[in-house]
Amino acid sequence: AVISNIGGETVEKLTRAFYDRDTLTVARELLGKRLVRVIDGRPLTLRITETEAYIGRLDKACHAYGYKRTARTETLFAPPGTAYIYLIYGMYHCLNFVTEAAGEPAAVLLRAGEPVSPADADAMAQSRFGCSAEEMSPYQRKNFLNGPGKLCKALKLTKAQNGLSLLGDEL
């Protein structure tokens, strides 16, 4: 197990071996796991509720289908357990976890999640809407973290975090 100090809290992280497996298996097993993002020394935690697998050798929807390497897709070829973050429609960031062996372009997209605590919900609501969780409208509450771009905005994830190791202390 990888033990990490995240925001002053000792946590057991998933190992590289967890990510170095079949992408569909990893996608299923990520459901219910917690993602911790440290911002200004404070950990924000969400439970992963929806994932989607992309396998470059098989899936035409994968950015690196057919082993296509570009500046954008280079992170998909990184070691398993690497964060792959990219921008879609010029405005929404998407977080993926690289899976399978290095050089094999495959990843799991995090599609949705839910805050673990009221404090996490407040911090994420502030990032998304500029208000506390209690002040969110019913519509905002219903659609809080139900999309990859919404999840990234709530966790303040951008392309600046692309390539981060999931074994480290920031994610």
Language model features: what each stretch is:
Residues 3-171:
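Conserved, well-structured core segments that form or line functional sites
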